[in-house]
From Swiss-Prot:
Cellular component GO terms held in the UniProt record: cytosol
CDD domains: AAK_G5K_ProB (cd04242), PUA_G5K (cd21157)
Organism: Desulfotalea psychrophila (strain LSv54 / DSM 12343)
Location of this chain's protein in the cell: Cytoplasm
Name of this protein: Glutamate 5-kinase
Function comment: Catalyzes the transfer of a phosphate group to glutamate to form L-glutamate 5-phosphate.
Enzyme Commission identifier(s): 2.7.2.11
SUPFAM superfamilies xref list: Carbamate kinase-like (SSF53633), PUA domain-like (SSF88697)
Domain PUA: 283-359
Amino acid sequence: MQLRREIFDKARRVVVKVGSAILTNVGGIHTSFIADLAREISYLRQSGHEVILVSSGAVAAGRKKISWQDSAPLGMKEKQALAAIGQSHLMRTYEEAFGFYELDVAQILLTHADLSHRDRYLNIRNTILTLLKFGVTPIINENDTVSVEELKFGDNDTLAALLTNLLEADICICLTDVDALYDKNPQKDPTARPLHIVTKISPEIEAMAGNSNSLFGTGGMQSKIRAAKIVFSGGGTAIIGPGRAPRVLQRLFAGEDIGTIFLPCKERMKSKKQWIAHVLKPKGTLLLDAGACKALLQGGKSLLPSGIVGISGEFDRGDSVNCCRLDGSRIAVGLVNYASVDVNAIKGLQSREIASVLKCCDNEEVIHRDNLVILS
């Protein structure tokens, strides 16, 4: 309890994420939950903490608003339309709840493309920090009305984690309908025990979250583990908290042993490398020989064309690509200095041969080490 209390006492900026499962009920938006959430965030604000809220619920709210009865899986156009209906209803509920405590809120809707462009990524940071300076609580959601499947964040757990790193927040709290991370499936095994502290996200910890077909499903426990890894790389603390527990945020900040806390790593990844590793979606893959893998993993070197034995995918200069061993295992991700057609032409060659093949040589490296993130 003492360790938890110390972590929360030091926290200045906090990201809180709430999902559809606890935001909605059979009657639509769970207004009493939002009222309680506003009260708790007001308490944190009064205690000197800055709070950013990441809120799901637009599609679910829209579905309830127009009494959508079709039980079939929603298509993209239905999701987008329901999000458009539900988002305004959701924000109105937040405005009323926070207004009771004389707090202002601001809506921010993001797509993955907003974070993929470095300038827009930094502009989002500046906007949110300015809102906090104004004393306004940002309420952020994925813009489901315009997002397409291949450019989605995947879930708001990921969005919350990315924002935690972007804003250099100290803590990311994911409030969920599950009490904590368990060592076994608690709905199937009565001996399952909650893990209250995780010091390292090992393969064993990831296995405890199940797979995408488990009871947790997409946006469930597995996505929260992925989010915790992102927060971990940025030097922050991640929390999985029981969203339906009374006064959950106040109890967490009091150091109470509820939920699961993922302790931060000691070394924070640089901001640009966090962006490369977690925000950008790789457009292709480079297969590397053993020598190149060793140079990257042990020598901290840049990737030269001589170590590349194969490529896949189509990409342009400046795009993100995976760097893999010959067996396909990924060791790094980075920004390429050459388009795929040029990399294919110079793979296996010495850097001094680039100019004779491409008729120019802007860079000796295919990926400079400053734009390379080692993953294993």
